[in-house]
Design a protein with these regions (language model features):
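Extreme N-terminal basic, low-complexity initiation segments
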Residues: 2-7
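Preference for intrinsically disordered or flexible, low-complexity segments
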Residues: 9-179
């Protein structure tokens, strides 16, 4: 694994790994459906299973797909859903409203997201649309957590806050607890 080059797309960022056939199989089991638009794996669980998949901005059938980083790991998606159900999105929006530095960082995260997605292809239908409500709202913690896991701490403050609130970590595998 490691960084690689894809014809026409240039070098993958250092944290992205080319998705292998085994990864696609794991992703399909994780998500319960056939995969579309898989470009790379941006983050992995401690056991090696994909945690965040990088998707192309236009999938095979021509549909625009704005979600660059898609959270796939079941324990992570459960935790994001739990945080959303607990109402943390409103709390995080208030934190952004109260903290100009966090708000600026969130706007920068939005721009980073758009830049990375645009490197995979221009899709006019979704131009300026990132994910998770960026740059002004907090709508989907799954997308924001995925961004933080893919890029590391300090890029997306809301994703970082959600990870801190969750107590969940890629460093502790819970993938096979129920097997």
């Amino acid at each position: 694994s490691g960084a690689s080059s894809v014809p026409g797309l240039g070098d993958l960022p250092m944290t992205w790994e080319t998705a292998q056939a085994q990864d696609i199989g794991v992703l399909e089991r994780q998500l319960g459906r056939p995969m579309r638009g898989v470009h790379a794996i941006a983050a992995r669980c401690a056991c090696g299973d994909p945690a965040v998949v990088v998707t192309v901005p236009r999938v095979e059938d021509g549909t625009p797909f704005p979600t660059l980083y898609y959270l796939s790991l079941p324990e992570a998606t459960k935790e994001a859903s739990r945080l959303e159900a607990a109402g943390l999105m409103l709390d995080f929006e208030q934190r952004l409203a109260d903290d100009s530095r966090a708000r600026s960082a969130y706007e920068a995260a939005h721009k980073d997201y758009l830049h990375k997605r645009d490197e995979l292809g221009s899709v006019p239908e979704i131009e300026g649309i990132s994910a998770g409500g960026m740059p002004t709202r907090v709508k989907c913690l799954h997308a924001l957590i995925a961004h933080s896991l893919a890029e590391g701490p300090g890029v997306n403050p809301v994703g970082d806050w959600a990870l801190a609130e969750s107590g969940w970590s890629l460093e502790v595998c819970r993938c096979r607890v129920d097997e």
